[in-house]
């Protein structure tokens, strides 16, 4: 017998429904979550038995969109969904980020969350629904999940904050912010903004956090109705004696190691300390594996680093809390590339290239919310050599896709409109060195490379990553964090923008109690850092170059009569194909008669434009044209006076005297002058040679 448990509540302009007990009853937990007609089915499965060889938390989140949800059949040969799209990967990360910190540190049981979109209202984005569903499913799973969490999308329209704006409203909003957190704390923020101030962003976060508490309360009521299975103690045990012994062996040496500011030398010393500790412990204890030893050493490192920052205000590399690493900015570093920059911040370095293409190079996206074309691409690559490691090289991982999306959002607000700069633009960031904040280095490098390419961006953009060390009421906000400060700290807060305002931010918080004061301090400290970086960037390249690269295609736009499009294309595309081959250009025609001609060489583009003008020109009766004989027949000759325009010179119009044989007066391909005598209703031309003399 199926016994559904249902909870409905009003959430902004939408009705949210949580339902369990009907489907996927063999899963640890399953919740059908709806916001109006957008429905996401979320399942959670957890392995109660701990695999002894597992020494990490193996949680995976899969988000998948089914095309039947939108009443469509997938494209492609197989007519079924394939590997995850970029959008699916990004939403899976959105679900993962606020959930992962809410599991205990030593919980290593395998967990899988699958969120499947099964119904779609085109006006309701399923990402918020998926986060709410995952929170509800985990809350009734019996796992040691320290939730529930809520989630909200916040827009900013006409100086008003909007809770969960629909898809159309987002298009006119100057803010698209997603927030997720518990009753007490914000855990995750992801935002794209159009030059908003720090105060506006803070208010949006506060508004969103307050509103999402409605979700938390309703999930708590929902969970009370469900018979939740009780999990036995499943945390990996702590060996106190072992911890004391390792502290005796290693603590003082680790303290000395962290007096070394050079990362490579410091890591080499720390590796030797770990190896020594492992050797001693294995000889003294039986049944102890390396993970237990290195885990304890990592905790010792964490305490040492955090204490140095909180008590002595000394960071790992010796900087002050608000000090930025040494910057090195170079542009035009790749000679044949349309635009390039090398941005170095300490031990983090990004090589950024910009390529300009035509609308044919745009990416066609087959998304659940509808098909669209993207003329701005941003790809982020993180090879293993960037951190001195050996690893697999291949298709981008989730992290690379996420960082690329953040960098793209950072730049989007300053990109020129397509009608002003009709290029498809691809930015690629190659991370050649990394010690924290590589995505923000990509933003800075991208801004410089765009200006080097002559792209008329409205403002230069810079990005900075902020961190936090917090113990009780004592805290320090760190500017331009290192990789270790991110790993050992309590917050990763990336902010990008111009001198005018913020364009994007991403915040992940690992602890409770992040106050308004802390967030405000982080935002304003980041603003100072951003302005400092922009001033350094300005010295290298202040404004976009006046012209694009000589190696980039020039795009020329002309307008023709839409009724003449068929003449330019020709039968089966014959005319446009001949034009592109003969002139070496790319020609694109839109339904409204807009024609875009692109070529690297200016002369070729001018030639193509002239030919198109000839084809589309209106033939005037009584005018004389240069023509070429294309066919000779018994009753006259056909003469072309332009591509697609051919007329008949009757035998009686060849000469003033009688003509018995046409070939006695004309030959094939002969150039002659002809006068237009008539254009009939079907557009056919009657020409005269004798009238042109």
From Swiss-Prot:
Cofactor list: Mg(2+)
Cellular component annotations (GO), alphabetically ordered: cytosol
UniProt: Mg(2+) binding residues: 486, 492
Domain S1 motif: 622-690
Any single biological process term in GO: RNA processing
Family, per entry: Belongs to the polyribonucleotide nucleotidyltransferase family.
Annotated function: Involved in mRNA degradation. Catalyzes the phosphorolysis of single-stranded polyribonucleotides processively in the 3'- to 5'-direction.
Protein name from the UniProt record: Polyribonucleotide nucleotidyltransferase
Organism: Buchnera aphidicola subsp. Baizongia pistaciae (strain Bp)
């Amino acid at each position: 017998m199926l016994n559904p448990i249902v909870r409905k509540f009003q959430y902004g302009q939408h009705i949210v429904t949580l339902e369990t007990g009907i489907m996927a009853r063999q899963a640890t937990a399953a919740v059908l979550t709806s916001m109006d007609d957008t429905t996401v089915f979320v399942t959670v499965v957890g392995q109660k038995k701990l695999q002894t060889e597992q020494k990490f938390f193996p949680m995976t989140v899969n988000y998948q969109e089914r095309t039947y949800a939108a009443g469509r059949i997938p494209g492609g040969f197989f007519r079924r969904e394939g590997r995850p799209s970029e959008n699916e990967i990004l939403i899976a990360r959105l679900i993962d980020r606020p959930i992962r910190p809410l599991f205990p540190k030593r919980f290593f049981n395998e967990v899988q969350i699958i969120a499947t979109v099964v119904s779609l209202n085109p006006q309701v984005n399923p990402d918020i629904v998926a986060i709410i569903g995952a929170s509800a499913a985990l809350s009734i799973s019996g796992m040691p999940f320290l939730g529930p969490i809520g989630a909200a999308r916040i827009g900013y329209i006409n100086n008003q904050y909007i809770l969960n704006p629909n898809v159309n409203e987002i298009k006119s909003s100057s803010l698209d912010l997603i927030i997720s957190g518990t009753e007490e704390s914000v855990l995750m923020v992801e935002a794209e903004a159009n030059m908003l101030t720090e105060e506006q962003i803070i208010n949006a976060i506060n508004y969103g956090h307050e509103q999402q508490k409605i979700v938390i309360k309703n999930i708590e009521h929902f969970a009370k109705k469900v018979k939740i299975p009780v999990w036995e103690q499943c945390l990996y045990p702590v060996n106190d004696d072992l911890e004391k012994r390792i502290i005796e062996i290693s603590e003082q040496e680790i303290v000395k190691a962290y007096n070394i500011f050079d990362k490579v030398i410091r890591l080499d010393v720390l590796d030797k300390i770990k190896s020594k500790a492992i050797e001693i412990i294995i000889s003294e204890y039986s049944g102890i594996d390396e993970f237990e030893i290195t885990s304890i050493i990592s905790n010792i490192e964490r305490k040492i680093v955090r204490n140095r920052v909180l008590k002595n205000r000394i960071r790992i590399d010796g900087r002050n809390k608000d000090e930025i690493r040494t910057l090195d900015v170079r542009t035009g570093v790749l000679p044949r590339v349309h635009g390039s920059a090398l941005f170095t911040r300490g031990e983090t370095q990004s090589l950024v290239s910009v390529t300009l293409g035509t609308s044919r190079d745009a990416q066609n996206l087959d998304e659940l919310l509808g098909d669209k074309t993207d003329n701005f691409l941003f790809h982020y690559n993180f090879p293993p050599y960037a951190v001195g490691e050996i690893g697999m090289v291949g298709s981008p991982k989730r992290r690379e896709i996420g960082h690329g999306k953040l960098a793209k959002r950072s730049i989007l607000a300053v990109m020129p409109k397509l009608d002003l700069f009709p290029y498809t633009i691809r930015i690629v960031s190659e991370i050649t060195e990394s010690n924290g904040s590589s995505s923000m280095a990509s933003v800075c490098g991208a801004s410089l490379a765009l200006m080097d390419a002559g792209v008329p961006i409205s403002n230069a953009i810079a990005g900075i990553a902020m961190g936090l060390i917090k113990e009780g009421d004592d805290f320090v906000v760190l500017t331009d964090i290192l990789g270790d400060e991110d790993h050992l700290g309590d917050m990763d807060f990336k902010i990008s923008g111009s001198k005018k305002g913020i364009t994007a931010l991403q915040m992940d918080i690992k602890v409770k109690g992040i106050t308004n004061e802390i967030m405000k301090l982080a935002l304003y400290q980041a603003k100072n850092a951003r302005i400092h970086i922009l001033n350094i960037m300005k010295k290298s390249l202040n404004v976009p170059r006046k012209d694009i690269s000589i190696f980039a295609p020039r795009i020329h736009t002309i307008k023709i009569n839409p009724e003449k499009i068929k003449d330019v294309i020709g039968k089966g595309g014959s005319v446009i194909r001949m034009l592109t081959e003969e002139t070496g250009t790319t020609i694109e025609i839109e339904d409204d008669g807009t024609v875009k001609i692109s070529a690297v060489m200016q002369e070729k583009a001018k030639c193509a434009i002239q030919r198109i003008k000839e084809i589309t020109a209106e033939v005037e009766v009584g005018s004389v044209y240069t023509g070429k004989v294309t066919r000779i027949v018994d009753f006259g000759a056909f003469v072309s006076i332009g591509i697609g325009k051919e007329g008949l010179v009757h035998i009686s119009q060849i000469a003033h005297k009688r003509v018995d044989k046409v070939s006695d007066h004309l030959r094939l391909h002969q150039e002659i002058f002809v006068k237009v005598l008539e254009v009939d209703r079907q557009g056919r031309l009657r020409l005269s040679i004798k009238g042109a003399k």
